[in-house]
């Protein structure tokens, strides 16, 4: 705990209070921020969590205070001022030989701290999912230091040359090189590939993947490099990670414990459920599907990506549907044919449509006792929301 408190829950709740028009509670929170919130504290904080929860929460509040009528005075600078104060502290994390941010920082000393675990390596997903908040802050302040520091991270990762767009889960802030071979889109791997920008985190340790953030960085900045990295990652995911279940032929996203070329593990974290929504965003460029069809860039590959997004969304919803409570577990181990778990060069691809029989689904979902808990993660809701907005298919509202 920090000596004077950092108000994690207060900051994280600001945008919710604004949307719900809880004016008295918001006024109390705002007064606390203005009078009590101080980042000059003798405290270590996680770089990633502080960026997405604290900085993201302040930036969300700043945006909504300008966008929603009656929320606060349009001249109220408190949220932006606190965001700038915090971001200036966070810049210390990027002061490494490679430009890859350290896992943590000491606030008052403004000093980056290597991870106490994982051999001191930084999480790839954490290092590559700080960009939306930092770039947005540069956009609204005119100070490009936040953009430049965050962009340098992506330049380093892109320069390493991940095999077919699939990045291992750890890299060194000292050398700027990957320190592991393991590839997964769940914990430690999800946001690189796709969470909403500037959404506060609702709880700590919300993990996401590089792929998720690649497409969202492209939609935020229109920088072609992020579209290229996203498309390469999607192709790699389709080639190396997507396998059907043994019985219902549901599409699942497996893991590569030993990297590209190794055998697959049929484990799928709830964290991976951002993927169908992100794939739909990438295929349609964020437009409704009916509008995207008329774009010159629309082709058979985009059709295939939308079909994959639909199939993966069904798998995600099934994780809830097959339990007696209707609540999904944290992890599912899927039934899969041994042939499908071999390396990509040994696997034959399957394009068979999945079954709609829930009785058949139940044979494919294996929930282990230690994984049978729910952390109220938002990934499935996000994908269902995006799939509804993009396809207008009412089934996604029903599932939601």
Which residues does each predicted region cover?
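Glycan-recognition and catalytic cores of secretory/periplasmic carbohydrate-active enzymes
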Residues: 1-400
């Amino acid at each position: 705990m920090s000596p004077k408190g950092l108000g994690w829950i207060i900051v994280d709740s600001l945008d919710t209070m604004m949307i719900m028009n809880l004016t008295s509670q918001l006024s109390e929170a705002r007064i606390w921020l203005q009078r009590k919130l101080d980042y000059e504290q003798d405290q270590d904080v996680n770089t990633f969590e502080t960026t997405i929860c604290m900085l993201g929460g302040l930036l969300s509040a700043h945006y909504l205070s300008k966008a929603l009528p009656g929320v606060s005075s349009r001249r109220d600078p408190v949220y932006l001022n606190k965001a700038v104060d915090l971001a200036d502290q966070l810049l210390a994390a990027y002061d490494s030989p490679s430009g890859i941010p350290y896992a943590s920082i000491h606030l008052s000393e403004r000093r980056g701290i290597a991870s106490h675990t994982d051999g001191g390596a930084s999480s790839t997903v954490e290092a590559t999912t700080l960009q939306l908040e930092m770039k947005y802050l540069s956009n609204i302040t005119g100070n490009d230091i936040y953009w430049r520091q965050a962009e340098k991270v992506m330049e380093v990762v892109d320069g390493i040359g991940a095999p077919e767009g699939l990045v291992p889960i750890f890299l060194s802030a000292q050398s700027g090189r990957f320190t592991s071979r393991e590839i997964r889109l769940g914990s430690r791997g999800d946001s690189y590939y796709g969470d909403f920008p500037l959404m506060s985190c609702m709880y700590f340790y919300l993990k996401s993947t590089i792929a998720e953030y690649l497409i969202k960085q492209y939609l935020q900045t229109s920088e072609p490099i992020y579209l290229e990295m996203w498309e390469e990652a999607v192709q790699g995911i389709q080639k190396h990670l997507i396998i059907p279940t043994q019985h219902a032929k549901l599409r699942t996203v497996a893991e590569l414990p030993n990297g590209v070329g190794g055998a697959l593990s049929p484990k799928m974290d709830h964290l991976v459920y951002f993927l169908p929504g992100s794939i739909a965003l990438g295929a349609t460029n964020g437009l409704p599907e009916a509008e995207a069809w008329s774009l010159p860039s629309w082709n058979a590959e985009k059709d295939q990506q939308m079909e994959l997004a639909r199939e993966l969304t069904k798998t995600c919803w099934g994780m809830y549907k097959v339990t007696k409570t209707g609540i999904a577990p944290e992890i599912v181990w899927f039934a899969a044919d041994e042939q499908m778990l071999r390396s990509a060069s040994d696997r034959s691809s399957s394009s068979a449509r999945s079954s709609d029989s829930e009785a058949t689904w139940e044979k494919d979902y294996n929930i282990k006792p230690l994984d049978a808990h729910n952390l109220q993660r938002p990934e499935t809701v996000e994908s269902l929301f995006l799939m509804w907005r993009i396809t207008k298919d009412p089934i996604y509202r029903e599932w939601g």
